[in-house]
Structures are given as structure tokens and as C-alpha cells.
Curated annotation (Swiss-Prot):
EC assignment: 2.4.99.17
GO biological process assignments: queuosine biosynthetic process; tRNA wobble guanine modification
GO-annotated molecular function: S-adenosylmethionine:tRNA ribosyltransferase-isomerase activity
GO cellular component: cytoplasm
Annotated gene: queA
Alphabetic keyword roster: Cytoplasm, Queuosine biosynthesis, S-adenosyl-L-methionine, Transferase
Family statement: Belongs to the QueA family.
Protein's recorded name: S-adenosylmethionine:tRNA ribosyltransferase-isomerase
Pfam families attached to this UniProt entry: Queuosine_synth (PF02547)
Native source organism of the sequence: Pseudomonas syringae pv. syringae (strain B728a)
Subunit structure: Monomer.
Amino acid sequence: MRVADFTFELPDSLIARHPLAERRSSRLLTLDGPTGALAHRQFTDLLEHLRPGDLMVFNNTRVIPARLFGQKASGGKLEILVERVLDSHRVLAHVRSSKSPKPGSSILIDGGGEAEMVARHDALFELRFAEEVLPLLERVGRMPLPPYIDRPDEGADRERYQTVYAQRAGAVAAPTAGLHFDQPLLEAIAAKGVETAFVTLHVGAGTFQPVRVEQIEDHHMHSEWLEVGQDVVDAVAACRARGGRVIAVGTTSVRSLESAARDGELKSFSGDTDIFIYPGRPFHVVDALVTNFHLPESTLLMLVSAFAGYPETMAAYAAAIEHGYRFFSYGDAMFITRNPAPTAPQESAPEDHA
């Protein structure tokens, strides 16, 4: 399969650069997997698509203010984007500067703080901070908005680029499907008899990296840390026993559940995953999906295509553009039920040069 099969033209005006006034006021495009039928709704209409006995699985990771500014002891300015917190004082980070810092060199953080560059691991730098990392980031860090939002972060982003149920600090990008849920909507979901469970996947900055190969099968995913607890395994089993559906809120919840069920059986799991779900890959756990609209040629669009079918997904995106849906992190959402027989892009016939 070619990466180019997953491209589409998106007007710049449809990129959502700010959140709406209320989380729940976004629009919802529903895609029925078995038929490909589309319907244009509001996000609060999601309640109509849920059934008593269903199980919704959310990602409770918390976005950390992972962007820091500072200077090397030699005076050169730099920007740090934390990719992963290793322990209380060490991180792996992307560092942007005119010259890369050398092992043993000191970095002075704007707003107060100091770090030492310990080692380089390919594109990432291991940094050790003099004080505990998470309190430092909360004090002087900036929210790591995605590159396509293309504006400085604002005070409101600390709240709005975060789900209302975020608990476990460690992500440098939000699990954006969850941004649409406010507390009253969660209470209404519970009142309908829908159960909830929480996994953790700390979303890394690699989620925004473009696919740099021509053939999908040649792509290697970045790794991210996740945890699927025994409570989630038990909740899924109970859902199956009562005839309910497992509904993943966001692609990170899908990747968590399917990573923990790679052999076909869901088991508790804690560790790194580099699972890459694209058309042709089976789904062992997830029956329905709440997700935002994703970037062209992204691995997330490929995951949705694997779930809903390639032609159905691309038709849905074309309809979303035609109807002016807002795209990406602060944009609108989809509710998709799984296609039982999804198809992949058709292989192009070789050209005849005779």
C-alpha cells in the first residue's frame, strides 16, 4: 500500500486553531461500518448511539507542559520538547539549537532551573535536571501544542488541551478524542447504563511525525509507554458476557487495547508499544471508535481506514471537508462502528511501457 493513497486536500480554514467555547459543542460525523452510511450530528448526539451495557474505554494520560526555553552555559539559545519522562530527574527530549549541546554541558532554563546533557540517543537527548522534573515543568513549562495549530500557547490551553479525566502525567500530546467530553456528558453516559474503563498511553511527539517512506509496510512506528490493567481486562470480559460493545475513545485507546491483545486475547500489559495498525490488520477488541479528523498520510488515518474500510474512510473525509467540519486536535469528531469486512486501497496496475 502506498502512503500517497492516504492524502487529501484540506483547506487551511478547516484547521481548528482554537477550541470551541464549550467542549461538547463540536460536531459529530457518524460512519456506520457495515453500510458506510454517514450522518451529520452534534457531539452530544453521541448518547443516541450508545447502548446500556456498552463499555467506553478512555485514555487517562495527562499532558505535561513539555516545552521549555533556555540557553546553554556558553550563551546559545535553545528550545526543549520533552518526549518522555524517564524518572524523577531525567527525560528524553528533542533539543533545537544552532549547535547541539555536548554531553556534560549545562543548560539554564528560562524561569529558573538547570539541566545537564547526559547523552544523545539518535535524535533525542537525555537530560538530567537539578530538581524534580514534573514540578519544574508545571512551574515554567509551556503546553506543547501540535505544529499545525501554528500559534503560541495561551493560558486557556492548560485546561482545554487536557481531558477532564486526565490523571497520569506523561503525555506530550493530548488524546484529542477525549477533549469533547465534559463532566455532565460523562454523567449522562453513566446514567444510560454505559460502563467506563481507563487505560494509559503517554502520547509522544512522534505522533506528529510524517511517514517518510513510500510503502506503508516499510514504516516503523515510534514507541510509546502504555498500561492496560487487569481491571480493564475484566471490564472487557464482562462487557462481552452481557452482549455489549467495546467503544474506544481515541486512537490511543485503540492502540492500547489492541497492543494488549496482539495474540488475540486481551491480557494486562505495561510497557512500550510500537503497534502500527493499517488496512489488513485485524481488530481483536474494539467494536466502535470515537476519534477526531486526522492529518493526511498519517498513521492515525491509516488506523481509521483499517477500522472502517479505506473507501468508506476517504468518502467520510471528503464529506467532512464539503460540510466544513473542523479538523485535527481542537476540531470535530467521528463516531465509527467497525466494518466487518474492510477493504484496503486498490493496488495500482503497473504501467505498460511497451
